[in-house]
Swiss-Prot record:
Residues bearing PTM N6,N6,N6-trimethyllysine: 5, 10, 28, 37, 57, 80
The protein's name in its UniProt record: Histone H3.3C
Gene: H3-5
Any one of the GO CC terms: nucleosome
Positions carrying N6-(beta-hydroxybutyryl)lysine: 5, 10, 15, 19, 24, 57
Positions bearing 5-glutamyl dopamine: 6
Organism encoding this protein: Mus musculus (Mouse)
Annotated positions of the N6-succinyllysine modification: 15, 57, 80, 123
PTM-bearing positions, type Allysine: 5
The keyword Aminoacyl-tRNA synthetase is assigned to this record: no
Chain positions with Phosphotyrosine modification: 42
Length: 136
């Protein structure tokens, strides 16, 4: 986000600062004895942008192998029982699935940007799929 220059404005009056009570002044000036330091937090969006750059650079699979394998076996169970899979077959399915999902999210992001938003919503996914011709 670009920094904007702030111009000085003439004051139009207002309330004069009141004198602080003695107890308030001593409370403010006394150092805190707790010494508990707040954990460092990045500004909203900083970590998200860092993750975007990290995942765009990388080529590794993003979905864990075993949960994906269980999902494939569960879906295949509906069509035929006692199916066996080569590990290369599940690897190929995972590569194709992740490539499809990444492409769908790219198109979904474009739909959100077109609607002047930065947050993707289910309606963006539906629009992206409809434009692709996957769902009428």
């Amino acid at each position: 986000m670009a920094l904007t220059k702030q111009t000085a404005r003439k004051s139009t009056g207002g309330k004069a600062p009141r004198k602080q009570l003695a107890t308030k002044a001593t409370r403010k000036s006394a150092p805190s004895t707790g010494g508990v330091k707040k954990p460092h937090r990045y500004r909203p969006g900083t970590v998200a942008l860092r993750e975007i750059r990290r995942y765009q650079k990388s080529t590794e699979l993003l979905i864990r192998k075993l949960p994906f394998q269980r999902l494939v076996r569960e879906i295949a169970q509906d069509f035929k029982t006692d199916l066996r899979f080569q590990s290369a077959a599940i690897g190929a399915l995972q590569e194709a699935s992740e490539a499809y999902l990444v492409g769908l999210f790219e198109d979904t992001n474009l739909c959100a940007i077109h609607a002047k938003r930065v947050t993707i919503m289910p309606k963006d996914i539906q629009l992206a799929r409809r434009i692709r011709g996957e769902r009428a």
